[in-house]
Amino acid sequence: MTNPKKIEMVNDFQQQFAKKMNELGFTYSNIDLYQQAFSHSSFINDFNMDRLAHNERLEFLGDAVLELTVSRYLFDKHPDLPEGNLTKMRATIVCEPSLVIFANKIELNQLILLGKGEEKTGGRTRPSLVSDAFEAFVGALYLDQGLDVVWQFAEKVIFPYVEDDELVGVVDFKTQFQEYVHSQNRGDVTYRLIKEEGPAHHRLFTSEVILENEAVATGQGKTKKESEQKAAESAYSKLKSNNNL
């Protein structure tokens, strides 16, 4: 038997999503894709839905689509910049704090389907959750409308911020740490997930950053990417203060 609360939430989402897409000037075909894009695992768990009905797979796809789209934009806009500079700029644009800025600009967080507990604990404004939903939406848009429409979306929501230099204060610690290590003529930097714990709707990830085959710092976060950023921030701070790991 279908849960009345679930029906109410889904119907409300579909109405609000249609309104949002109209505001943005885009059409869509497969509403199920977008519903999945905005379905947090806590919502799926609350209503005992298929365990893969949440947005994490679309987030994975959207992450890659965003990187490609931003890479093409930077490649065309800066024909004289070397690869290293382009990589740094891309990292700043697609990192979590920037994605939250883009998502908040168009209030995408209001569309996210959350479980009761996640809603009560402020999940709707949690940066990692909002950035994940933004990536998942991009993944759904790509599958539903294609790369050209993703580009048009980026022209409205992402590129204006880049062109106005509004992301100057955004820090991508992985890039910052990598650059500092390179300036010190140190070895390769890699990241490894060492722990994943907690219920599906409230996971906690722990990652470590490895420099020259030695683990030098760890970080925790609600997502793997967030834990890597925290590890990089810790390692960078340690390296800067000691100038020797």
Curated annotation (Swiss-Prot):
Listed InterPro entries: dsRBD_dom, RNase_III, RNase_III_dom, RNase_III_sf
Record-annotated active site: 63, 135
Entry's Gene Ontology BP terms: mRNA processing; regulation of gene expression; rRNA processing; tRNA processing
Keyword terms of this UniProt record: Cytoplasm, Endonuclease, Hydrolase, Magnesium, Metal-binding, mRNA processing, Nuclease, RNA-binding, rRNA processing, rRNA-binding, tRNA processing
Principal localisation: cytoplasm
Listed Pfam families: dsrm, Ribonucleas_3_3
Start and end residues of each stretch annotated as Disordered: 217-245
Record EC number: 3.1.26.3
UniProt xrefs under Gene3D superfamilies: 3.30.160.20, Ribonuclease III domain
Compartments, as annotated in UniProt: Cytoplasm
Residues holding Mg(2+): 59, 132, 135
Broad class of enzyme this protein falls into: hydrolase
Ranges where the DRBM domain occurs: 172-241
Domain of life from the UniProt record: Bacteria
Every RNase III domain range: 17-146
Cofactor(s), by name: Mg(2+)
Key word Disulfide bond present: no
Matches recorded under SUPFAM superfamilies: dsRNA-binding domain-like, RNase III domain-like
GO cellular component, as recorded: cytoplasm
Signal peptide span: none
Catalysis performed (reactions): Endonucleolytic cleavage to 5'-phosphomonoester
Gene Ontology MF annotations: double-stranded RNA binding; metal ion binding; ribonuclease III activity; rRNA binding
Function: Digests double-stranded RNA. Involved in the processing of primary rRNA transcript to yield the immediate precursors to the large and small rRNAs (23S and 16S). Processes some mRNAs, and tRNAs when they are encoded in the rRNA operon. Processes pre-crRNA and tracrRNA of type II CRISPR loci if present in the organism.
Quaternary structure and interacting proteins, as annotated: Homodimer.
HAMAP family linked to this entry: RNase_III (MF_00104)
UniProt-recorded name of the protein: Ribonuclease 3
Gene: rnc
